[in-house]
């Protein structure tokens, strides 16, 4: 799965710094929410992403949450593999899957899953619960269905992963730290066929804004969260 195929090519880097530099040349999974806009509460607005990719911003230093998430990722991935012995879970460090159809779109998955003849993406998250209202909005049952939610910015990211890979499903595997210190593991599964309309819409938005601002070298407007 970490091999060149008709859908994507695989680029491997010698260091994390080299990988970070390569991310300036296109749209990565963590950029997707910024392209969608402030309604999905991205970590950065599109102007900040534009400045990052143009080399106009200072390198971002790890904060405590980022370091914790990166340290927990291999442990979470191993836990998931143990909990799902019928699945093969693979991972390759400092690599990038690049879409053949749209080379400006790439993805660095936390893992890839083989389940019989189905291929999936593994996405690992850590989440600190601060308020009950926000937790219910991000992870609770939707008011109009029996489906459980995930944060909007994570949903944009997994859609982006499906666009690049063409895979059948995504698993979001999250370690939640509650305000009293106890932990909870959450799994959310999404089949590609359930999100086809969302995939088309994200592709349209990403391609339109990539051409309008990044290819044309036009500074995007400041979006207020």
Region roles according to the model:
Residues 7, 86, 221-222:
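Generic low-complexity segments that are intrinsically disordered, proline-rich and/or Lys/Arg-biased
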Residues 47, 77, 158:
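Generic structural marker for isolated residues within well-ordered, non-membrane alpha-helices
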């Amino acid at each position: 799965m970490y091999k060149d195929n008709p859908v994507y090519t695989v680029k491997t880097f010698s260091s994390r710094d080299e990988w970070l530099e390569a991310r300036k040349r296109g749209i990565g999974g963590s950029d997707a929410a910024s392209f969608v806009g402030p309604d999905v509460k991205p970590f950065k607005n599109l102007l900040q992403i534009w400045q990052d990719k143009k080399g106009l911003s200072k390198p971002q230093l790890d904060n405590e949450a980022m370091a914790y998430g990166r340290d927990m990722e291999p442990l979470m991935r191993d836990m998931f593999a143990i909990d799902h012995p019928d699945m093969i879970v693979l991972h390759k460090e400092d690599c990038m899957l690049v879409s053949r159809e749209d080379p400006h779109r790439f993805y660095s998955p936390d893992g890839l899953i083989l389940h019989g003849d189905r291929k999936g993406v593994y996405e690992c998250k850590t989440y600190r619960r601060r308020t009950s209202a926000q937790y219910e909005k991000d992870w609770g049952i939707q008011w109009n269905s029996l489906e459980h939610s995930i944060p909007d910015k994570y949903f944009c990211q997994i859609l982006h992963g499906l666009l690049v890979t063409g895979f059948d499903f995504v698993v979001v595997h999250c370690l939640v730290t509650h305000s009293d210190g106890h932990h909870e593991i959450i799994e959310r599964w999404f089949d590609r066929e359930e999100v086809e309309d969302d995939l088309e819409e994200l592709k349209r938005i990403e391609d339109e804004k990539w051409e309008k601002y990044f290819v044309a070298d036009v500074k995007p407007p400041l979006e207020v969260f």
